[in-house]
From Swiss-Prot:
It is an enzyme of class 2 (transferase). GO terms for molecular function: ATP binding; sulfate adenylyltransferase (ATP) activity. It comes from Synechocystis sp. (strain ATCC 27184 / PCC 6803 / Kazusa). Its EC number is 2.7.7.4. Pathway: Sulfur metabolism; hydrogen sulfide biosynthesis; sulfite from sulfate: step 1/3. This is Sulfate adenylyltransferase. It catalyses: sulfate + ATP + H(+) = adenosine 5'-phosphosulfate + diphosphate. Keywords: ATP-binding, Nucleotide-binding, Nucleotidyltransferase, Transferase. NCBIfam families: PRK04149.1, sopT.
């Protein structure tokens, strides 16, 4: 049994593909040495890839000024579609000055390898403080997302892009499932409702609980850990992926779960990033998206449920993906199971609250997270990694 892929429409109705056809690729390679170059950092490189594979549909390139300003101020594109986070290529004045609008620009990765081209349609200055305050709700440069804005150049380069080649991920090639492939997988399994789960943390019992709650009411679960750029104190992606492999192998029904990597970078934009993450999963073919406590947050910049409440600012049909909102789950010592205030009669003294932050703190102190926090196999994997034994 299969379901129509058209029933799970990408954002804007069409899955964008900006992988250069072979003929164009050869043309770009032939003129590569004659093109002006822009070197991309890790985040811009992952943005380039996400645009090319359709993860950022309907974007075909880095945002022009009208889209950028509407996204920053009103969380929508110039065509009216919801979009909450700017996707821009910011460079210094020195890099921007010689570039001519209407020309091709060679895009190199941080190692200097030619990976894509930009058809330059605009160069424009932008207000860093305005972007920070609107997107991140703060201009505090201690915020990692705000710091990126202030560290990057003052000029945005805009225009459609082409990615020369979709290379296998160096660490997780078997889990590199791009949007066209995930949609096909969902259809082959006959899934009509699919819930996506975003994380940058190792899986703990609270995650497992809300994932399984969601799985009770949909056909399939798409575990989609982010493996792009994150904060330096986040658990490394290879460790997180091993933890997810352990969980899928031992604690989930394999026929109802697909594990794949999300190559995009974290912005730590809290509520706005929750919308962004939901739209990405819509492009991958998900019909539902899990939004938990302080989704995509950092520090104390956002309220516990701000990332859930922001969904109420959009018409459901405009987003086209259903948020599944979960309260902060905890281990209940009274009922001896995972619960939330909706299902547990216990008082605060009988609740063990879990978080990736707490797990990281235990690991840094050389302590094995207790079974209320983490499955034992996952805890062992984490402690091995922290001790440098992996």
């Amino acid at each position: 049994m299969t379901t129509s892929l058209a029933a799970i429409a990408p954002h804007g109705g069409q899955l964008i593909n900006r992988l250069a056809p072979e003929a164009e690729r050869q043309e770009f390679l032939a003129i590569a040495d004659k093109l002006p170059r822009v070197q991309l950092d890790e985040r811009a490189t992952s943005d380039l890839v996400m645009i090319a594979i359709g993860g950022f549909s309907p974007l075909k390139g880095f945002m022009e000024q009208d889209d950028y300003e509407l996204v920053v101020e009103e969380m929508k594109l110039s065509n009216g579609l919801p979009w909450s986070v700017p996707v821009t290529l910011s460079v210094t004045e020195e890099v921007a000055a010689p570039l001519e609008v209407g020309s091709w620009v060679r895009l190199d990765n941080s190692a200097g390898k030619f990976i894509g081209v930009l058809e330059l349609t605009q160069k424009y200055h932008y207000n860093k403080a305005h972007e920070a305050k609107n997107v991140y709700r703060t201009d505090d440069q201690a915020h990692p997302g705000v710091k990126v804005i202030y560290d990057q150049g003052p000029v945005n380069l805009a225009g459609p892009i082409w990615l020369l080649e979709r290379e296998p991920h160096p660490l997780f090639p078997k889990y590199q499932i791009d949007p066209a492939a995930s949609r096909q997988l969902f259809a082959e399994r006959g899934w009509k409702t699919i819930v996506g789960f975003q994380t940058r943390n190792p899986i703990h019992r609270a995650h497992e609980y809300i994932q399984k709650c969601a799985l009770e009411v949909v056909d399939g679960l798409f575990l989609h850990p982010l493996v792009g750029a994150t904060k330096s104190d986040d658990i490394p992606a290879d460790v997180r992926m091993r933890c997810y492999e352990i969980m899928v192998d031992n604690y989930f029904p394999k026929e109802r779960v697909i594990l794949g990597i999300n190559p995009s970078a974290m912005r730590y934009a809290g509520p706005r990033e929750a919308i962004f993450h939901a739209l990405i999963r819509k492009n991958y073919g998900c019909t539902h998206f899990i939004v938990g406590r302080d989704h995509a947050g950092v520090g104390d910049y956002y309220g516990t449920y701000d990332a859930q409440e922001i969904f109420d600012e959009f018409a459901p049909e405009a987003l086209g993906i259903v948020p599944m909102k979960f309260e902060h789950a905890f281990y209940c010592k009274k009922t001896l199971q995972m619960a939330t205030t909706k299902t547990s009669p216990s008082g605060p003294e009988d609740r063990i609250h879990l978080s990736g932050t707490k797990v990281r703190a235990l690991l840094r102190d050389g302590q094995l997270p207790p079974p209320e926090f983490s499955r034992p196999e996952v805890a062992q994997e984490l402690i091995r990694a922290m001790q440098g034994e992996s």
